[in-house]
Amino acid sequence: MITEKKATWFVMRDLKRANAKLPAYKFLQEKNIRVFTPMRWYLSEEKGKKVRKQVPCVRDLLFVYDYRETLDPIVELIPTIQYRWLRNRYREPMTVSDVEMERFIRAVSASESPKYFLPEEITPDMLNRKIRIVGGPLDGYEGTLVSTRGSKVKRLLVELPDLLAVGVEVNPEYIQLI
């Protein structure tokens, strides 16, 4: 069970429409709560002009870093913001360790064009070799080299187990095979 006095990364859901004016990640940021939502670039049209903006890559997924006692009243007050619950456990929300989450956020922010994968999208054919990054913004990271058919870009796979994975571009000069 989670101790109530420690800030933790909670996995949460936002059930609002995709075009909502104030999605949960913006609402929680306004409340000065630390939120991470995996984002992607999207080209849309507003008033006849094409506009490039960032939108969540998985619409209902967000990671919130705070105390459970701070989040519980918000979840009770706003029915579209919910915890994701662990299966076969009674009222225990999903969490991600601080170390894993910080590693994931750092990897995503180091790449201009991260490519997100759901666990079921990763096939054994995509996973090549174990690598370590030596130098650059991702220095010290270890993981799997991801190959996508037809792409010359080298990507390191950084995972949040059972939730999400991201392939971040890596300069070949920083790659060391393990």
Regions found by a protein language model. Name each.
Residues 133-142:
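Short coil-to-beta-strand transition motifs
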Residues 2-130, 146-147, 152-155, 159-177:
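Acidic-enriched and Gly/Ser
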